[in-house]
Regions:
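Phosphate-binding loop and its immediate beta->loop->alpha context
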Residues: 31-169
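Residues that form ligand- and interface-recognition hot spots within folded domains
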Residues: 16-19, 24, 59, 83, ...
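Gly/Thr-rich phosphate-binding beta-strand-loop-beta motif of the actin/hexokinase/Hsp70
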Residues: 1-35, 198-238
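Conserved nucleotide-binding/hydrolysis micro-motifs of P-loop NTPases
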Residues: 155-157, 191-192, 218-221, 230, ...
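Beta-strand elements of modular eukaryotic interaction domains
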Residues: 3, 28-29, 41-46, 54-55, ...
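Glycine-rich phosphate-binding loop plus the immediately following alpha-helix
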Residues: 50-59, 74, 228-244
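Extended hydrophobic secondary-structure segments that form protein cores and membrane-embedded regions
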Residues: 11-13, 145-153, 183-188, 211-215, ...
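Hydrophobic, small-residue-rich alpha-helical packing segments that form membrane-like cores
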Residues: 164-212, 216-217, 235-236
């Protein structure tokens, strides 16, 4: 069982690297209702709240990611699942054509799962920082101490989180900055969903209320129930152990 609270200033900036799509926010505001969602991505002329978690490498080794992946390129998705050991994946996912294809792609390109996640996170991070600098200015960004939150499946074991941490470090997210060290935090995906839902305008959760959160993604499904212990700030704990 686990418990968590929603702080008065939400964690920032959060990144949900999922199997098929990814969303990212620049959260410099104290008001949780005033969150800046990154919607501009390389390779597309329209605004999108999420981008496909897809990666390819050019003949020269250049990284193409998300909407920037050429339509005729050999690409990989679902690569985050490969951070898990085979004994910790179920049979259905093991025979998934996407997962088999991902393993073959990494073998062919001489990449590890950590390398693939790192390359994608690195491209995402550069794009995000560039957008924030454009909106806020370089001096403002240079003065900020970053706190980065990456959401992961609730049932992930410690070694998988360590692999994700290594990928984030390898991506340059944790590199030394004059403003101070960057803090990297992992949040369970259902917890992030619950936090997002409960801070929506007009919602008034009461003490003792129970919420069931179903996170049905492209590669995993988590279902967890939370009971509200207090409302100011909102503190919750698992009502029953989560399954996924």
């Amino acid at each position: 069982m686990s418990s968590f609270s929603i702080p008065s200033r939400p964690r920032s900036p959060p990144s949900d690297i999922s199997w098929r799509c990814l969303g990212h926010t620049d959260e410099l505001q104290k008001d949780p209702n005033d969150i800046n969602l990154i919607t501009n991505w390389p390779g597309t002329g329209r605004e999108e709240s999420k981008c496909p978690t897809e990666l390819s490498y050019g003949d020269d080794g250049k990284i193409h990611w998300s909407f920037d992946v050429p339509p005729d390129a050999s690409s990989v998705s679902w690569f985050k699942l490969l951070l898990l050991r085979e004994e910790d994946t179920n049979d259905d996912r093991d025979v998934s054509e996407y997962l088999v294809s991902a393993r073959e792609f990494l073998s062919r390109t001489n990449k590890t799962a950590i390398d693939a996640v790192s390359d994608f996170l690195g491209a995402l991070w550069k794009n995000t920082i560039a957008k924030i600098v454009c909106a806020r200015g370089q001096m403002v960004v240079d003065a900020l101490v970053f706190r980065v939150v990456i959401t992961v499946p609730a049932i992930w074991k410690g070694y998988a989180r360590q692999a994700m941490h290594k990928a984030a470090d390898q991506a340059g997210i944790l590199k030394e900055r004059a403003a101070g060290p960057t803090e990297l935090v992992f949040a369970n995906e259902p917890e992030a969903a619950a936090m997002s839902t409960l801070i929506e305008r007009g919602r008034r959760p009461g003490t003792g209320g129970v919420y069931v959160v179903c996170d049905a993604g492209g590669g995993t499904v988590d279902m967890i129930s939370y009971k509200i212990d207090q409302v100011d700030p909102i503190c919750m704990k698992e009502a029953v152990e989560g399954k996924g």
